[in-house]
Amino acid sequence: MLPVANPDGLIAETRFNTHGVDLNRNFPAANRQNTARFGLAELSEPEAVVIKDLMDKYEPDVIISIHQPLNCIDYDGPAEDLARVVAENCDLPVRKLGAMPGSLGSYSGLVRGIPIITFELPGDLGRVSRDELWERYSPALLAAIAYPAK
């Protein structure tokens, strides 16, 4: 479990790291683009390298990512059934957003074939307590964790 992939972005309340790079566009994938905002090279950012190294070391059967604010369960790679099981346990619909350039979803789901779902939580959760978030989304999260992999 990696509680925060972008600690600098969390503190600054932005999706970009200290170098101004969107880490969720910095992974090696056929659809990746070399730009200042996505990184001038794949895995140019230490945070993305850490995630890749963790994937190499632990070889996860499934990846569960939590984002905001698109209000859905997205998936990449062989994860459609998992996404549907998760959505049955919360108020978020399954919505295939497509493989974003150099995203963790593109890398894990399409390049490595690891099922990945993304809880895209609603954007209006600023005043929701942790207890209420857990009450609202724990059944879905637990369903994802319990889902039979491979």
Where are these regions (language model features)?
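Active-site/substrate-binding loop(s) of hydrolase catalytic cores
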Residues: M1-G98, L121
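Active-site-adjacent mobile loop/cap segments within catalytic or ligand-binding domains
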Residues: N24, Y75, P101-K150
